[in-house]
């Protein structure tokens, strides 16, 4: 599923190099824990995404433990773009995901990009994945 078929004008993949330091990383594997800690600050983002992605569980206290990782990443991207007004978001850690999980994440990010036109860069060490989405 190449980028151009999904029509992601603001979403791209980039090769992740060692020692990249950015203040606006969205860490993939620790996001569930991060959301549980920061839940009160992200309630608006969670409510928006519950509606936008039609998440069945609407109890905000349990959503961070029940939602899939792709939705949790989308919540964090939304929170940083809309609430913290960052110009660019970097997502890392997708090398541990299956192709299906990555496609689901891209679809969720596409929904966000319809509402906001900021750069979202997905970092990867996987050259095959990188070439596939160019």
Give the residues covered by each predicted segment:
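ABC ATPase nucleotide-binding domain signature region
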Residues: 1-47
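A short helix-turn-beta junction within AAA+ P-loop NTPase domains corresponding to the substrate/partner-engaging
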Residues: 132-134
């Amino acid at each position: 599923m190449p980028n151009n078929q999904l029509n992601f004008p603001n979403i791209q993949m980039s090769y992740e190099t060692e020692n990249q330091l950015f203040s606006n990383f969205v860490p993939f594997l620790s996001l569930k824990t991060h959301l549980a800690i920061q839940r009160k600050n992200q309630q608006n983002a969670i409510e928006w995404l519950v509606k936008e992605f039609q998440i069945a569980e609407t109890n905000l206290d349990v959503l961070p433990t029940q939602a899939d990782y792709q939705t949790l990443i989308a919540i964090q991207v939304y929170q940083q773009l809309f609430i913290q007004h960052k110009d660019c978001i970097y997502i890392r850690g997708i090398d541990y995901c299956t192709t299906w999980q990555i496609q689901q994440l891209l679809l969720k990010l596409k929904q966000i990009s319809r509402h906001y036109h900021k750069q979202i860069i997905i970092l990867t060490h996987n050259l095959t994945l990188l070439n596939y989405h160019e």
